[in-house]
């Protein structure tokens, strides 16, 4: 494994998500970084996109047997930082270790309109014990 501390932080996230690895997809900057590690990937002469977060695509419903996702995240040193006014609020799941700015965000497909019939925004939902942001086109992953 790479000695880069960012990879160690990412590994803690993956460890937390182990029971659901068949149901989740790593997207965004970390997907590009991981692709470079594949034996068939072409070596590139520039550094990969660096982000402080890992984006995790979740299905709208996830099978949970045993601990929920948040409990496993907390056991691996992550803590929820709630943002915004939505219900549930959007969240960054940050590592609590000093000096490590790494965090995870969860994203779920937006089904229907961004605003419901009664005027309530459909921006977030609770999935498997974590707050997930609803976004268009996540389902194509």
Q: What is the meaning of each model-derived region?
A:
Residues 1-141:
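Compositionally biased terminal segments of proteins
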């Amino acid at each position: 494994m790479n000695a880069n501390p960012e990879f160690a932080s990412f590994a803690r996230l993956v460890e937390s998500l182990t029971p659901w690895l068949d149901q989740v997809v790593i997207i965004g900057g970390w997907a590009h970084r991981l692709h470079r590690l594949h034996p068939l990937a072409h070596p590139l002469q520039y550094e990969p996109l660096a982000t402080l977060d890992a984006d995790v695509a979740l299905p709208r419903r996830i099978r949970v047997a045993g601990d929920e996702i948040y409990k496993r995240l907390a056991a691996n040193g992550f803590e929820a930082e709630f943002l915004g006014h939505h219900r549930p609020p959007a969240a960054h799941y940050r590592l609590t270790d000093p000096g490590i700015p790494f965090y995870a965000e969860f994203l779920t497909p937006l089904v229907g309109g961004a605003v419901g019939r009664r005027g309530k925004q459909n921006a977030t939902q609770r999935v498997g014990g974590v707050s997930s942001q609803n976004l268009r086109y996540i389902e194509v992953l």
